[in-house]
C-alpha cells in the first residue's frame, strides 16, 4: 500500500437516520499526490449520495502531533452538493485514542532500513462528535449529532501541504 498511498482519513458513522462512510486518500509522489474521495451517505438504509465528484473535503484547526510529527485536524468535513440539496458531514476530534509510529516496535535494523527507504508511517485513531446536516437552498432542514470514531493513516513523509488540507 505504501507504494500507492501517502495518507488517508477514513471514517464511518451512524447518526440519526443516516449512515456515512467517508474517506480522503492521497496518492504517493509517483502518482502526483492526487487525491481521491470515497463517500457514501445513506438514509434509512437507502443510499442517497455516493457520487464522489460531488464531494469536497476540508480540514480545520490542523496541528502537528507531538508523538508522530504528522499534521492532525481537529475537524474533517465532507460536503456533498447535488442540485438544491447539500449534506455536510463533520467529524470533530475530542480525543486521540491511539498514536502509533508504525516502525517503533520493529527491530532496530528494520527501523533503520525503513528510515533509509523513506518510510515514515504513523497511525492515529480519534473519537469525537459527528454532525450530519442537510441544507435545501442553503437553509438547514435537518441536523443530527452523535459520537464517532475515525482514523488517519500516514505511510509517507509529511509534506507542507498536508498541514493545510483542502480539496475543492
Sequence positions of predicted segments:
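Structured soluble/peripheral alpha/beta segments that form catalytic or ligand/cofactor-binding pockets
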Residues: 1-168
Amino acid at each position: 500500500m505504501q507504494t500507492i498511498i501517502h495518507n488517508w482519513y477514513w471514517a464511518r458513522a451512524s447518526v440519526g437516520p443516516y449512515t456515512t462512510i467517508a474517506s480522503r486518500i492521497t496518492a504517493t509522489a509517483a502518482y502526483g499526490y492526487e487525491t481521491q474521495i470515497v463517500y457514501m451517505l445513506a438514509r434509512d438504509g437507502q443510499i442517497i449520495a455516493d457520487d464522489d465528484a460531488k464531494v469536497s473535503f476540508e480540514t480545520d484547526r490542523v496541528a502537528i502531533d507531538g508523538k508522530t510529527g504528522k499534521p492532525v485536524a481537529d475537524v474533517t468535513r465532507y460536503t456533498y452538493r447535488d442540485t438544491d440539496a447539500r449534506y455536510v458531514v463533520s467529524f470533530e476530534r475530542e480525543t486521540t485514542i491511539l498514536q502509533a509510529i508504525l516502525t517503533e516496535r520493529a527491530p532496530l535494523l528494520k527501523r533503520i532500513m525503513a528510515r533509509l527507504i523513506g518510510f515514515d508511517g504513523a497511525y492515529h485513531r480519534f473519537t469525537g462528535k459527528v454532525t450530519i446536516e442537510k441544507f435545501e437552498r442553503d437553509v438547514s432542514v435537518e441536523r443530527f449529532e452523535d459520537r464517532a470514531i475515525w482514523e488517519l493513516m500516514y505511510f509517507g513523509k509529511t509534506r507542507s501541504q498536508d498541514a493545510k488540507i483542502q480539496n475543492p
